[in-house]
């Protein structure tokens, strides 16, 4: 019994002694308040913490490793010269304020001043100057953009009061960068796992591929089967190399040894025989001959290196460094690579015999997620190597020159290079790393600040590297392996459907941990080193191979014992808590993973049919004595990744625990992500409705943070009076949505009222709107810089201009202050000027001698454009990083709901306002309550949003009881309890009320279902979309009306509309639309030759006798002229009608 206490995961071992003292028939008492573990988890991990953990790992650990790996710079010109990096540090955020003054800065200041929130990267170096050896400390080599809330950030460890002093919202999650004043997020990137064998059928060819990835190299190696023979394929070789040649090149020369690595059973011998004969036919018998054969198949390099190597040396170099780059080679011993290749061959053989052994690319255990830390470390490594290479070339060039001063390498270290590289990568989102041939676009995006939830939802977004245009269902479909790791509802509709995903609530993404300690534990637990055994035991059916991060570690005879011991050590805290151990019985392998980018989540451990977390542990958590990490250290909870979940039996709740159960889910609602967690009773809705709400919840306006009044964003929507929802969910409280809500509780009557509510349109009560329902503020900004130029001229801002006759300020300049900038509080109309800026006509000439007063200036004013007037909220004058004056103006508009504005409930039920009715005409119930909104009942049956009806009931009961009801997923308040509460307060238990018509005053014939529902006002407002045109600007080239609302464009009558008019035979209408109202043009045509004439003169006929005037569209005339220029001459034949 003692050994079983160690947390056994195996089904066979869980047989119990019938004389055991415990009685299994006694049901397990459910733990109360087990969900309190979720907020405890979210304090330390989850949501945005993975971005921050990853970045912290980079600036504290990875950056030191990168500098250590490239610590020495030497020069071929002078053997005594060297530059050695001793240490590297990332400092605290600061900003250069000119005159060599640097001061500490805050993210808010960087947002306002359009600068980058970054910290200096400093190094300690030792180098030689001539014959001296010099040490320098704290030398700046560049600036690192800092992630908000990382370990070096100014906000870390501050209390709410201190954060408010820094103008920062305490609920802001952090995890993004501020680059040139813009908030940028590095999205989580989904990749196929590295260093892992994947067997697949590629156009009928069975192949096993490995993508090796180390710090130095990335390469892809394939073993494939063609015509009954096996080959190895790699990009650096022109042709597939027979596998036996590879074995011989790797030093396994005898055919018997090769066969014993593959397997000595008759099946393996029969399948592998043809490959052995193939090598015999090629006359390859020795390692040297194999290397020469490989050398003849190498791809010719474009740049020949200075030291020319023979083809066989090139081939050996390739085998050592590039093919299977992740398999370690000690001292030119290639045995491990030979063993690895033999395993790949065996995988291909097995898959040929049994088609079920193909690996699934879309299985989520085969994926890794790249976070900001790993992407930035690749970028930094590339820039750092480039800087060192440049220093080396400068040294090579300058040391041989005879100079008065000796060569000093410090003078050539340019900090701007690394700074600009990191900044431009984050601000443009283009990650280009030449060494890995990596070119990615769209890695970063601007943080969406429509609402608090849209910002949070963006931090948990996972971006796939798959092309969006291909209509493939595999990568898009919901995989069973994504259970609990990714949100099943939160994905966009359209082309990105299923490719852009979101993390679930309790998902954690691992960061890399050192594998050395785990290897020592594994060897102590009974793993034998594979290098010390021959090929035969490897193929023994009782022997299991042990892999660590894709590399072969060794083999074991007692795999259950090994797995049990490793898990026991992990639970006792002797090993990292994110190390995963899982068994694959089909491949006879045990995989240990310590790498970063795996998805995992915490589970309660179950032993002997009892969860290890007891009620007294939860009470300690409640009292604040116990933290989430204590549960991990005491071995009560552990993290499982996608692969290890396959080895476990996980119960949904306490009732489902059986004999073989190994783990218990902490809380079912953590299956959903942030956006889907806002929906009350999502398990009562049809699935796509929850998906629609996830998309619309991000467009709902509300509050974006406590500091929203101090921000100057390019576009910001604020709801004037947001409510916390009456029906909450646990996720709403965990994500602080109730503190920064986006919506209002509207009293809704579900009934038909006039014809203005068909197709989901809503009818609003005018009195409610007058009291402030759905009212919002829209903030926009305008900005300009005032620069000084190289020729000593500069921009200037002029005061307002006066009319010469009346001596009054002209209308355009009416809102300007005397300094030429608009004053706060003014109302600005369309085309009025806000900043009266002028710019010198010449900025790039030589400095002007004594004539700076006569420089001609051109006016480049910043004016207001918009159909409705705005108010100036604030004007800010500052300076940005380039020492230019920066002026920002914040404009405010108050929008009142009008017909055509879009609203939606939290169940994917969207609709526009169809009619606004006076309160006198609205129906009212016998308590005198008048609804804010009337919704058509036809929105319910086909949509099956039962969650909405439950929300209405719960909200109504909550109002009467004075409490919030919970509509948490897979739980929440029970309908029976809600109905009992309604009955207790004298209301009908099904939520229907007795209503009177507001128009006639008589009772309505049916009872009306009514109560409060949480409605969101969406950003789509009719004022921003409404567009019509009678006359306006035309395009220069075609003389047709311009296109688009912003350019006052026309509405195009397209090909389909034209076809429709042709089918009606409305020829005069076609002519009026397509020519007269668009681009009619009179042109002269010669009746003799059919060409166009000019001024009644035909140039071709040299005559004006037969020239007529006709009308045609200008675009048609242009087409004829363009064709003529290409030697295609259209001729027009004219007839009289």
Swiss-Prot record:
Q: Where found, per UniProt?
A: Nucleus
* Zinc finger feature spans (C4-type): 1084-1099
Which residues does the record give as Zn(2+) binding sites? 1086, 1089, 1098, 1101
Identify the EC number(s). 2.7.7.6
GO terms in the biological process aspect are: tRNA transcription by RNA polymerase III
Tell me which domain of life the UniProt entry assigns to the organism this sequence originates from. Answer: Eukaryota
Reactions accelerated catalytically? RNA(n) + a ribonucleoside 5'-triphosphate = RNA(n+1) + diphosphate
Name a single GO cellular component: mitochondrion
Q: Which CDD domains match?
A: RNA_pol_B_RPB2
Name of one Pfam family that matches:
RNA_pol_Rpb2_7
Assembly description: Component of the RNA polymerase III (Pol III) complex consisting of 17 subunits.
Q: What family, per the record?
A: Belongs to the RNA polymerase beta chain family.
Q: Which PANTHER family match?
A: DNA-DIRECTED RNA POLYMERASE I SUBUNIT 2 (PTHR20856)
Q: What is this protein called?
A: DNA-directed RNA polymerase III subunit RPC2
Gene designation per UniProt? Polr3B
């Amino acid at each position: 019994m003692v050994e079983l206490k160690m947390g056994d995961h195996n089904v066979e071992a869980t047989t119990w002694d019938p004389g055991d003292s415990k009685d299994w028939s006694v049901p397990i008492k459910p733990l109360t308040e087990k969900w309190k573990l979720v907020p405890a988890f979210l304090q330390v991990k989850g949501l945005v913490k993975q971005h921050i953990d990853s970045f912290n790992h980079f600036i504290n650990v990875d950056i030191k490793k990168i500098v250590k790996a490239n610590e020495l710079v030497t020069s071929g010109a002078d053997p005594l010269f060297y530059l050695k990096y001793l240490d590297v540090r990332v400092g605290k955020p600061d900003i250069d304020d000119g005159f060599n003054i640097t001061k500490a800065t805050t993210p808010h200041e960087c947002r306002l001043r359009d600068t980058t929130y970054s910290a200096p990267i400093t190094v300690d170096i030792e180098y030689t100057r001539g014959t001296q050896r010099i040490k320098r400390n704290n030398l700046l080599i560049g600036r690192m953009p800092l992630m908000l809330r990382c370990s070096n950030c100014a906000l870390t460890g501050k209390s709410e009061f201190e954060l408010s002093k820094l103008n920062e919202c305490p609920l802001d999650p952090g995890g993004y960068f501020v680059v040139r004043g813009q908030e940028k997020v590095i999205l989580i990137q989904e990749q196929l796992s590295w260093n892992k064998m994947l067997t697949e059928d590629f156009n009928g060819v069975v192949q096993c591929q490995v993508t090796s990835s180390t710090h130095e190299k990335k390469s892809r190696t394939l073993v494939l089967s063609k015509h009954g023979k096996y080959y190895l394929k790699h990009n650096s070789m022109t042709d597939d190399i027979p596998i036996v040649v590879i074995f011989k090149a790797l030093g396994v020369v005898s055919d018997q040894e090769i066969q014993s690595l593959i397997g000595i059973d008759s099946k393996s011998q029969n399948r592998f025989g043809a490959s052995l004969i193939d090598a015999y036919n090629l006359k390859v018998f020795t390692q040297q001959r194999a290397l020469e054969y490989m050398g003849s198949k190498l791809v010719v390099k474009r740049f020949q290196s200075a030291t020319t190597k023979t083809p066989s040396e090139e081939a050996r170099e390739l085998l050592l460094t590039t093919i299977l780059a992740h398999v370690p080679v000690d001292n030119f011993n290639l045995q491990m690579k030979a063993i690895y290749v033999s395993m790949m061959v065996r995988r291909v053989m097995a898959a040929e015999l049994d088609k079920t052994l193909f690996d699934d690319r879309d299985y989520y255990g085969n994926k890794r997620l790249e976070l900001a830390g790993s992407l930035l470390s690749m970028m930094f490594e590339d820039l750092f190597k480039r800087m060192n290479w440049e220093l080396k070339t400068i040294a090579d060039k300058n040391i041989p020159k005879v100079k008065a001063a000796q060569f000093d390498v410090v003078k050539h270290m340019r900090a701007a290079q690394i700074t600009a590289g990191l900044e431009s990568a984050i601000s443009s989102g283009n990650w280009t790393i030449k060494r890995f041939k990596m070119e990615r676009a769209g890695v970063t995006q601007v943080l969406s600040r429509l609402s608090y939830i849209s910002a949070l939802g963006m931090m948990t977004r996972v971006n796939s590297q798959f092309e969006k245009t291909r209509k493939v269902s595999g990568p898009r479909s919901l995989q069973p392996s994504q259970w609990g790791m990714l949100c099943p509802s939160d994905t966009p509709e359209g082309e990105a459907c299923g490719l852009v995903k979101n993390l679930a609530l309790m998902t954690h993404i691992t960061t890399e941990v050192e594998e050395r300690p785990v290897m020592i534990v594994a060897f102590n637990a009974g793993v034998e080193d594979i290098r010390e055994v021959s090929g035969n035991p490897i193929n023994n059916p009782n022997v299991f191979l042990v892999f660590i991060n894709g590399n072969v570690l060794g083999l074991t005879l007692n795999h259950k014992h090994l797995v049990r011991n490793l898990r026991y050590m992990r639970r006792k805290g002797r090993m990292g808590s994110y190390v995963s151990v899982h068994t694959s019985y089909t491949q006879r392998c045990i995989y240990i993973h310590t790498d970063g980018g795996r998805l995992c989540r915490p589970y309660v451990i179950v032993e002997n049919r009892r969860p290890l977390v007891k009620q007294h542990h939860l009470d300690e958590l409640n009292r604040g004595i116990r933290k989430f990490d204590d549960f991990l250290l005491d071995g009560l909870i552990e993290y499982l990744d996608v692969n290890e979940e396959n080895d476990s039996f996980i119960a949904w709740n306490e009732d489902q625990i059986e004999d073989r159960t190994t783990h218990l889910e902490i809380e079912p609602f953590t299956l959903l992500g942030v956006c889907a967690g806002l929906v009350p009773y999502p398990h009562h809705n049809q699935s796509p409705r929850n998906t629609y709400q996830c998309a619309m919840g991000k467009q709902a306006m509300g509050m974006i943070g406590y500091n929203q009044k101090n921000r100057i964003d390019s576009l910001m929507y604020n709801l004037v009076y947001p409510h916390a929802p009456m029906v909450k969910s646990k996720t709403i409280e965990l994500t602080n949505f109730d503190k920064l809500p986006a919506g209002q509780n509207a009293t809704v009557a579900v009934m038909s009222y006039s014809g203005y509510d068909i197709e989901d349109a809503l009818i609003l009560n005018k009195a409610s709107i007058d009291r402030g329902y759905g009212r919002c503020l829209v903030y926009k900004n305008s900005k300009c810089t005032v620069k000084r130029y190289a020729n000593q001229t500069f921009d200037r801002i002029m005061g307002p201009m006066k009319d010469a006759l009346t001596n009054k300020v002209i209308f355009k300049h009416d809102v300007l202050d005397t300094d030429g900038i608009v004053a706060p509080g003014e109302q600005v109309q369309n085309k009025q000027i806000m900043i009266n800026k002028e710019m010198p006509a010449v900025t790039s000439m030589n400095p002007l001698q004594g004539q700076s007063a006569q420089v001609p200036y051109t006016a480049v004013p910043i004016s207001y454009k918009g159909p409705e007037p705005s108010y100036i909220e604030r004007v800010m004058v500052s300076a940005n990083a380039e020492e230019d004056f920066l002026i920002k103006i914040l404009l405010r508009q108050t929008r009142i709901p009008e017909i055509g504005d879009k609203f939606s409930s939290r169940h994917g039920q969207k609709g526009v306002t169809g009619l606004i009715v006076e309160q006198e005409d609205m129906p009212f119930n016998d308590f005198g309550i008048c609804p804010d909104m009337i919704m058509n009942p036809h929105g319910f049956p086909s949509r099956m949003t039962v969650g909405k009806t439950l929300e209405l009931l719960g909200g109504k009961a909550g109002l009467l009881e004075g409490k919030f009801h919970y509509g948490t997923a897979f739980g929440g308040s029970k309908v029976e309890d809600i109905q009992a509460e309604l009955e207790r307060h004298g209301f009908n238990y099904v939520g229907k009320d007795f209503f009177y018509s507001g128009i006639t005053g008589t009772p309505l014939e049916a009872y009306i279902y009514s109560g409060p529902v949480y409605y969101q006002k969406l950003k789509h407002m009719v004022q921003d979309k409404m567009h019509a045109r009678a006359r306006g600007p035309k395009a220069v080239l075609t003389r047709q009306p311009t296109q688009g609302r912003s350019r006052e464009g026309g509405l195009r009558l397209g090909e389909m509309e034209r076809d429709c008019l042709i089918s009606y035979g409305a020829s005069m209408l076609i002519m009026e639309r397509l020519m007269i109202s668009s681009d009619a043009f009179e042109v002269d045509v010669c009746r003799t030759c059919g060409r166009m004439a000019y001024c009644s003169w035909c140039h071709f006929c040299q005559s004006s006798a037969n020239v007529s005037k006709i009308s045609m569209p200008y675009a048609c005339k242009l087409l004829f002229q363009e064709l003529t220029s290409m030697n295609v001459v259209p001729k027009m034949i004219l007839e009289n009608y």
